[in-house]
Design a protein with these regions (language model features):
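ABC family nucleotide-binding domain
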Residues: 2-215
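C-terminal boundary and immediately downstream tail of ABC-type ATPase nucleotide-binding domains
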Residues: 220-241
Length: 241
C-alpha cells in the first residue's frame, strides 16, 4: 500500500504522490515510458530504495519506519531482475537451494527436492548440475524465477524480466510467469511485453513522469480504447510498430 509516496534522488523527483494498493493474488502490470518511475516503485516495495515521504505498508510492515527489518520484508517479497544475478560459481541446483538453506534454515534434502520440482516447473530439470555460464539468457532467467519461488514468498516483483533476452527466448520466460500467475501468486510486473500485460495481468497501471496516470482492472478497455491522453499516445506508438 502506497499512500502519498514521494521519492527523490537528490533534486530529481522520481515518484510523485503515488497511491497504490495491491491485494493478495493480483497480477499487476506496470507499463509506461522509460524513466517514468516504474522500477523505482518495485525497488521501494522490497526496500532497495527508501521512500522520501508518505507511507508504504508491505505485509503489515511500515517501510517508512527506519526500525523496520528489511530482511523480513525480503523473505516475503521475491524479486526477479532484468539481469539474472545468479552465482556463476554455483550450479543451478545450488543457486536455488542457497536461500532456503541459509536464510530460512531449512532441511537440505527437503529444499533440494523442492528445487528439483521447481526446475521441472520451469522446464529445466535436466540442467540441475549445469552452471549459469552454460545456459542461455532465457534459461538463466527461468532459474532466477525458480530461485525466487524457492523462498516461498507472498509476492514476487518482476523488473523488466525479458528486456535483456533474445526475442526467441522471451516466450519461455513469459510462459513460466503465466503459470505462476495461474497458481495465485501475487505479482507486480514492470514490462514492455504488452501481450503479457493484456492477457495475464488482471490490473494495469500506466506511469509517466513519476505519476500514476491510469490504474484499471479493465485491461482490455485500456488497450482497445485508452481514455487518458498520455496513455493513448503511448499505446498507439507501441501497437502500431
Amino acid at each position: 500500500e502506497f499512500h502519498d509516496v514521494n521519492k527523490y534522488f537528490g533534486k530529481f523527483q522520481a515518484l510523485k504522490n503515488i497511491n497504490l494498493t495491491i491485494d493478495r493474488g493480483e497480477v499487476v502490470t506496470i507499463i509506461g515510458p522509460s524513466g517514468s518511475g516504474k522500477s523505482t516503485v518495485l525497488r521501494c516495495i522490497n526496500g532497495l530504495e527508501r521512500i522520501t515521504s508518505g507511507q508504504l505498508i508491505v505485509n503489515d510492515f511500515d517501510l517508512a519506519d527506519k526500525k523496520t527489518d528489511m530482511n523480513r520484508i525480503r523473505k516475503n517479497v521475491g524479486m526477479v531482475f532484468q539481469h539474472f544475478n545468479l552465482y556463476a560459481n554455483k550450479n543451478v541446483l545450488q543457486n536455488i537451494t542457497l536461500g532456503p538453506e541459509l536464510v530460512l534454515k531449512r532441511d537440505k534434502a527437503e529444499v533440494e527436492q523442492e528445487a528439483r520440482d521447481l526446475l521441472k516447473m520451469v522446464g529445466l530439470e535436466s540442467k540441475a548440475d549445469s552452471f549459469p555460464g552454460e545456459l542461455s539468457g532465457g534459461q538463466q532467467q527461468r532459474v532466477a524465477i525458480a530461485r525466487s519461488l524457492a523462498m516461498k514468498p507472498k509476492a514476487i516483483l518482476f523488473d523488466e524480466p525479458t528486456s535483456a533476452l533474445d526475442p526467441e527466448m522471451i516466450g519461455d520466460v513469459l510462459d513460466v510467469m503465466q503459470k505462476i500467475a495461474e497458481q495465485g501468486m501475487t505479482m507486480v510486473v514492470v514490462t514492455h511485453e504488452m501481450g503479457f500485460a493484456r492477457h495475464v495481468g488482471n490490473r494495469i497501471v500506466f506511469m509517466d513522469d513519476g505519476k500514476i496516470l491510469v490504474d484499471s482492472t479493465d485491461v482490455n478497455q485500456f488497450f482497445d480504447d485508452p481514455q487518458e491522453p498520455r496513455a493513448k499516445e503511448f499505446i498507439s506508438k507501441i501497437i502500431n510498430h
